[in-house]
Amino acid sequence: MFVDQITLELRAGKGGNGVVAWRKEKYLPKGGPYGGNGGNGGSILIEAVTNMYSFEEYRNLRFLKAGDGQAGASNNRTGKNGKDFVLKVPEGTLLRDAETGELIHDFTKDGERIVVCQGGRGGKGNVFFKTSTNRAPTKATPGKPGEIRLVELELKLIADIGLVGFPNAGKSTLFNTLARTEVKVGAYPFTTLHPSLGLVHQEGYLYQKPWIMADIPGIIEGASQNRGLGLDFLRHIERTRLLLFVVDISGIERSSPEKDLQILIGELLAYKEDLKNKSMVIALNKIDQLLPDEREERLALLKQQFPDQEFILLSGLTGEGVDVLHDLFKSKLSE
């Protein structure tokens, strides 16, 4: 299950109590105070990691708690500190205060780690209160409570390539071809109900780091106003380095590729205008359904209407044109 938003109550550990104790040894009948301090409560930290792509493992959790500090002991022994809790999250996670909406941190790199809830300080034992005028203090203090915070975690996927298109444009088929994997494919809208992630290996470069590709669920007209799957997944487009628009050029499932492309670009810009600055490629898919003359005719019409866009003819089903797309990825993603 893909989970990209959760709310959690985070509870840091309570500090251990300080204690009142006395030094009792045979040759020290008036040994004085000997009570130790309490241990500090454990803190809650959040750390971004690679190879984690959703909050699925936390979907049934409502709160997380770090360990409490232990009480001090006689012989001036300090209690053991409570164990910290480190919450692992995917790169691309936004951390917000659920009550104020304040952005606490944006996790963009592997290994980024911050303290979100500080553990409570341990209390002081009676040794701490010994002075020249008070040689036998009977005072000790309790440990401080740990911080409690209600937070929201929201994921915006960080991917090299984001596949964007209408339902039934053939995105999932193309995704399977590029990533050499299998996501669900079907001849009905919204086959993809959550983003799928795959790796696209650079052809001829076995030891190069592969590109991360995200298949974004199908966009419909009005997605920027939260129609269809709407805003739930439009946010995942924001952090992709390259947008690959997948448009059905065959005219079988959808009658007008020109209108489709106009709506797709319009919805993205309505959601966030600065997406226009992203690198884009238009993949005209399902050319296996057309004769060569038909392909070129429809391509020419699209180029006329969208002169600033870069187009490529391909078939996710047969693989035709995919090698050219690989070359485009290499040139665009190395810029």
Curated annotation (Swiss-Prot):
The keyword GTP-binding applies. Mg(2+) binds at residues 172, 192. Pfam families: GTP1_OBG (PF01018), MMR_HSR1 (PF01926). One of its GO terms (molecular function) is magnesium ion binding. It comes from the Bacteria. SUPFAM superfamilies: Obg GTP-binding protein N-terminal domain, P-loop containing nucleoside triphosphate hydrolases. Coiled coil: none annotated. Belongs to the TRAFAC class OBG-HflX-like GTPase superfamily. OBG GTPase family. This is GTPase Obg. It comes from Chlamydia muridarum (strain MoPn / Nigg). The lineage of its organism: Bacteria, Pseudomonadati, Chlamydiota, Chlamydiia, Chlamydiales. The gene is obg.
